[in-house]
């Protein structure tokens, strides 16, 4: 009977110890000579045999037949568990069962040497597994029932290994070490060669954008604070300078990768996973470009063997050490980041490229755009046609020559774009890549060429990592906004020139109202322009240059640049709809006023006076709304940008004393 027992405990039930799929291994009831206490001891041992049989079935099921499932990925989602982490778990589980098998062999040798040994001896000898097997079975059952997959297996095993039972902890740590072997192989391929070896989508890095977990904020966020149409949600947005979606900014040009945070083990922080993601992206980008440009050298400075040895050393450790792991990741990341920094800043002249971005997208070359506005003013007043884009680019080239900007290498990289009605092929391509434009709706044609005007720039490798299409699109939004402010300022200055030409002529009350309105409009627009160029652009750009010059780490540069662009969009109020809408309304009123003045050089007739009255009331209303928004936000003690603009507009308290209204006087 002892041999029957040992065979049953080895997974081979017989007539004395029977197997039932539901209840497992049990002592047969047909033996009256067994004392109840003996039956109890034998059934206790049978529980070990039951667990062992189920362990071996699990191992055979997921290591023997998993290869057949590889060719049917569609069935994997329905058919249950699969993947290399599961196979590694089975391998580790098998190694944990080895001491149990050895114990059965040792017992057999002891019984052969001493046939008088009792069942109690077997019970005593195998007692060490009575704690271990049920605890490991909990892990196996959880993996099966919850269909735990990939790196989630690491998390499950790790959580159960944190208990206080030394044999259980030791066994699960052994299984975890085997599973980590798979992770280290994937890490080596990704970080050293830029290869994502993940057939079953088990790794915590995936190809494609991140799924995004934006939680919907219901109507409770929309409470009206009575601040000129400013809602609670918008007020809270004022406090957040990072309102811009950063997702596409971090993407390389060829393929986009992202973290699969939901399966990242909890003992690997997200900050470490992001470093791993960055290294792999950079290596892949560089390897792909090496093929195209046959560049010499490696982004890892030919230290692949050293780093591979360090990762192998980590793999050999019986226990995972986050400190050692992060140190190795940091060393690889530092090497990659420093190489990219050198490539960007020293070889590709990043500072020069940023200067170009500032000169053109941020209107740093003011004399160029002043000349362009004068040259292109008439051709962009009307809705654009198929030839407008060509004409505008000719005008841009002529303006560049006028201001002695004759850089043959730079100008071909810049191209002014016009989105006109009927330009479907380009609009479709743009919308597929970036979504609809902020300025014009795809359903309606732009009212004028100015509304459809944009700027494109051909970014050279490897700066495309920093200046992605999404980043350039955001620069384009700022460009359109700054150009519209500059154009209004130029038109108001032209009106002032007309006023000076007629100052010797007799003027009436309507003329006084007209020129005072121009004065108030120019005051507001000039201060807005000064705020944008000095308080926002120059200030943020100098901070960006300082951060670039104070580091040798590419990732720091990218974060600084992302922060710079976010601040531009936030501090210029493009992201703050109440202020942005109000400013656009004011700019439109200024356009209308300049058109009225240009068309009526002499005294205004009755119709012109009526139009002027409408403009005065509109400007008064919008300037009052702007003042309310700026003052209300200042009173809430948030957003220093709005307070800075208010300081520019109300430095001598004239705005306050006028009741927060400009351009309001008797007709």
From Swiss-Prot:
InterPro entries the UniProt entry points to: GCP, GCP_C, GCP_C_sf, GCP_N
Region (Disordered) location: 425-445
Primary localization class, coarse: cytoplasm
GO molecular function: gamma-tubulin binding; structural constituent of cytoskeleton
GO cellular component: centrosome; cytosol; gamma-tubulin complex; gamma-tubulin ring complex; membrane; microtubule; microtubule cytoskeleton; recycling endosome
BP-aspect Gene Ontology terms: cytoplasmic microtubule organization; meiotic cell cycle; microtubule nucleation; mitotic cell cycle; protein-containing complex assembly; spindle assembly
Record's subcellular location: Cytoplasm, Cytoskeleton, Microtubule organizing center, Centrosome
Family label: Belongs to the TUBGCP family.
PANTHER family (alphabetical): GAMMA TUBULIN COMPLEX PROTEIN, GAMMA-TUBULIN COMPLEX COMPONENT 4
Name assigned to this protein: Gamma-tubulin complex component 4
